[in-house]
Design a protein with these regions (language model features):
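Non-catalytic accessory segments flanking enzyme active sites
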Residues: 12-13, 18-20, 182-184
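A broad, low-specificity signal for short, low-complexity segments enriched in glycine/proline
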Residues: 1-12, 45-47, 84-88, 161-165, ...
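A general structural signal for short secondary-structure junctions and capping/turn motifs
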Residues: 15-16, 39, 115-117, 247-249, ...
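Short, mixed-charge, low-aromatic patches
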Residues: 15-19, 121-129, 246, 250, ...
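C-terminal catalytic domain of Rieske-type non-heme iron oxygenases
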Residues: 56, 134-349
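Rieske [2Fe-2S] iron-sulfur-binding domain
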Residues: 3-7, 11, 20, 25-146, ...
Length: 349
């Protein structure tokens, strides 16, 4: 007699879809200060970023309200964005300031301006489908290491587009048991803390690439910006670094990933030696991170994963993450409460 196996239905629900509310990293701020407009394919549309003479970086909807031309293909002239199609000129706020062949400017001749901020030498853009600014305290934190000259203030950012839903990336925040199989990094301690818009991970272990005694506390500040502080013994040298892991959605099933690494100088070493150590450590972190990328590129989104008892707080994470996809007044008050979950603790007492 044959035994009929129970069928497991894989749920993958993406519609209707909205893009996450929060700050999203657009990379090194200085790259936008080159006197040119920059194309940004994000949030299911196209934006344009450009800097004015005072150094401020502005982000606007890229499609000209006149005839729909792409403003990111234009030029910058006297702090104005000039459309390549008819040379309409737009100011930093997105308002048309000049039409070369007409004195009267239509009142509707303006394009949307997006809220931006700079922090830690990085540019961020705010997305909120409701059109509201961030609430008090919803910020990208200033890293004190940016004020410390013992750190090499270079993020060494890599950029790539990945064809999967951004939640696949965020799931890693609670995935204690992939470190061994994917990274060769046995986990000795792993915990998560969720509080408001911040999701923390505390990791201890030993890494084949990044050295022994690895301690790596990290946090998502909103849905898309993740900083990790790393300390480890790398080739007999105590190394301290900060990783940047950020993404901006392009479509519901693709995102631009920015991965960066900033390293602290080792006392007693020359600048050349420190640069070599930093280069090696950045390479090691990059290789480790790309092991995750290889998985993300070839997996699908599953909304109802079958979990083992000790898989960690996957559903709690997704509940936390979901708050960024709903109207703010519908976010449960319980999201503000501190929740701590320890998944692995093999430390010797």
């Amino acid at each position: 007699m044959m035994t009929k196996l129970a069928e497991i239905k894989v749920e993958n629900v993406l519609e209707p879809y909205r893009y996450a509310r929060g700050w999203h990293c657009l990379g090194d701020a200085d790259q936008y200060r080159d006197g040119k407009p920059h194309t940004l394919n994000v949030f299911g549309t196209r934006l344009v970023a450009f800097a004015t003479s005072d150094g401020k970086i502005n982000v606007l909807d890229a499609y000209c309200p006149h005839m729909g031309a792409d403003l990111s293909q234009g030029t910058i002239e006297n702090d104005r964005l000039v459309c390549a199609f008819h040379h309409w000129k737009f100011d930093a706020a997105g308002k048309c300031a000049e039409i070369p062949y007409c004195k009267r400017i239509p009142p509707k001749a303006k394009t949307k301006s997006w809220l931006t901020c700079e922090e830690n030498n990085l540019l961020f853009v705010w997305n909120n489908p409701e059109g509201k600014p961030p609430r008090e305290g919803v910020v990208i934190p200033h890293l004190p290491e940016m004020d410390d000259d013992s750190w090499i203030h270079n993020w060494n950012i890599d950029i790539m587009e990945i064809d999967t839903n951004p939640r696949e990336l965020v799931d890693n925040l609670v995935d204690a048991h992939h470190f061994g199989p994917v990274h060769g990094t046995p986990t000795t301690y792993f915990a998560n803390i969720f509080e408001g818009h911040i999701g923390h991970q505390i990791f201890h272990g030993d890494s084949e690439r990044l050295g022994g005694g690895l301690v790596a506390p990290s946090a998502y500040y909103g849905p898309a910006t993740h900083f990790t502080r790393i300390s480890s013994n790398f080739g007999g040298v105590e190394i301290h670094a900060i990783l940047l892991n950020s993404h901006v959605p392009v479509t519901p099933n693709s995102f631009v990933l920015r991965f960066g690494c900033m390293v602290k100088r080792v006392e007693g070493f020359t600048e050349e030696q420190n640069n070599e150590i930093a280069k090696g450590y950045v390479t090691g972190n990059r290789e480790s991170f790309y092991q995750d990328v290889a998985i993300w590129k070839n997996k699908i989104r599953i909304d109802n994963p079958v979990l083992a008892e000790t898989d960690g707080p996957v559903y709690q994470l997704r509940e936390w993450y979901q708050q960024f996809f709903m109207d703010e007044d519908k976010v449960p008050a319980s999201m503000a409460e501190r929740r701590e979950i320890v998944t692995v603790d093999l430390r010797k007492s």
